[in-house]
Amino acid sequence: MSNFEKVKEFNDAFNTSKVKEFNKDVFDTHPDMINLCLSLIKEEVEELEDALLNKDVVETKDALADILYVVYGMQYRLGIKGDNDFSIVHNSNMSKLCNSQKEAEETVEYYENSFKTGSLSYDTPYFEKLDNLNKWVVKNKSTGKVLKSINYTPVKWTD
């Protein structure tokens, strides 16, 4: 059972309100449900901020799990297929990796040129090989941020 399915089980057990199919009308037809879900998410993010400020390991773990729980819950209640959407985003994120050293070199060159022209702020792009995946990752050294390959595939959502 996936985490999304566990949260679905919880929501079904407690008979929480939900919509049958996600569409833009839900914002007008179910504002109370949306506001409740959003307030739960905000509450859990605030708890995470407090836990991090206090360097509280237990409360950090709790808050992170609770954030996932309330986000999955909102997806379910809005009629969004959480596991499906997560897989779509995951596949897009994995396309940030480069399939060859040549692609990694070209990606670094792209970011270097973009920094010089001022169109992007990544000042120290570099790549490293991920032997476990036989892929290359491009990162910005000064921030540690993973950068997108020149062949990155963004998510294409439909309504």
Predicted regions and their residues:
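Flexible "arm" and connector segments at domain edges
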Residues: 1-64, 68-159
